[in-house]
Amino acid sequence: MSVRLVLAKGREKSLLRRHPWVFSGAVARMEGKASLGETIDIVDHQGKWLARGAYSPASQIRARVWTFDPSESIDIAFFSRRLQQAQKWRDWLAQKDGLDSYRLIAGESDGLPGITIDRFGNFLVLQLLSAGAEYQRAALVSALQTLYPECAIYDRSDVAVRKKEGMELTLGLVTGELPPALLPIEEHGMKLLVDIQHGHKTGYYLDQRDSRLATRRYVENKRVLNCFSYTGGFAVSALMGGCSQVVSVDTSQEALDIARQNVELNKLDLSKAEFVRDDVFKLLRTYRDRGEKFDVIVMDPPKFVENKSQLMGACRGYKDINMLAIQLLNEGGILLTFSCSGLMTSDLFQKIIADAAIDAGRDVQFIEQFRQAADHPVIATYPEGLYLKGFACRVM
């Protein structure tokens, strides 16, 4: 008999709506013993079967659902089915947009909670973010090896969130050959170098692909400031869009060096690109104090908020940095501003931008809205999957 997680009375509603998480407060008791990440059955207070998921005793998310089908076992065949289903959509996108790199698995939205897989050419970069994902590592890797024999697999599960579920961070080659120090990929006509082994996340922010492309329509003959530039994807896109100058700012010299290489790789005019190692908040104030002006500003900061207790502070941070950006824009200038914090709703982010404009003494029009690229889908029953939001704003 399998181990069962029994829900408290009335706490089954979210599962009946096929939400993939069971929170600790919804649990009445466990029947049997399960190890960290082990597969368990989830039942209501009367014992009616609801779902099958991965158990995590130390997490507020006590179980993550693998399947709502009682006949489905969690094994190699299960992971193969999920991977093949996800690949169909990515195949269409890759062909339509000419991509050689994309997010293959987007966690819960692809029916594989806690699992992220990005494909860069013939390298699969794996992140296992939950106890259940780690428990199923061998089955997942076996399915990947069968379906993608041409691909090497590299583990980038060096993510702090693993510690919340009692797991160590892991990093390194799983199968195949080691990725090169910098792997070239293609995106909307750009060639970009990706550092799989040491870069942010899995090496590159694939979720901003469509936003980078959209930037081109605003930048012709314009002076652009690219904040939190990382390896320069927005900068390269701005140069391809015909900007007169782009200034990229980041605290990492390594990232700025790759950004410079990306400009050179695309045979763009390096004299139009400036790379500044500095703190963005500090530099924006310096620019304001000396009267610098820009026509377009890209504001793509890292996540400011990890949990609800940090939300108020994050709101202040987002408001301050966008206020400074608005002050630096010429009349009619464009602010492209983003938040990748899942707890930051689109409505709240829009209000923060409005408040920033008031504090800056400027009027702002919202002219375009952004979200994560289409290879990062959001399943209807899991709205938390929509984490990236952004706006194009015209400053009056």
Curated annotation (Swiss-Prot):
Enzyme class: transferase
Gene3D superfamilies the UniProt entry points to: PUA domain (2.30.130.10), RNA methyltransferase domain (HRMD) like (3.30.750.80), Vaccinia Virus protein VP39 (3.40.50.150)
EC number per UniProt: 2.1.1.191
Ranges where the PUA domain occurs: 2-81
SUPFAM superfamilies on file: PUA domain-like, S-adenosyl-L-methionine-dependent methyltransferases
Signal sequence coordinates: none
HAMAP family, A to Z: 23SrRNA_methyltr_I
Pfam families: Methyltrans_SAM (PF10672), PUA_3 (PF17785)
Statement: the UniProt record of this protein carries the keyword Signal: no
GO CC terms of this entry: cytoplasm
Encoding gene per record: rlmI
Keywords: Cytoplasm, Methyltransferase, RNA-binding, rRNA processing, S-adenosyl-L-methionine, Transferase
Catalytic activity: cytidine(1962) in 23S rRNA + S-adenosyl-L-methionine = 5-methylcytidine(1962) in 23S rRNA + S-adenosyl-L-homocysteine + H(+)
UniProt-recorded name of the protein: Ribosomal RNA large subunit methyltransferase I
Summary of the function given for this chain in its UniProt record: Specifically methylates the cytosine at position 1962 (m5C1962) of 23S rRNA.
Entry similarity comment: Belongs to the methyltransferase superfamily. RlmI family.
Protein location: Cytoplasm
Organism this protein belongs to: Shigella boydii serotype 4 (strain Sb227)
MF annotations from Gene Ontology: RNA binding; rRNA (cytosine) methyltransferase activity
Main location: cytoplasm
Keyword RNA-binding: yes
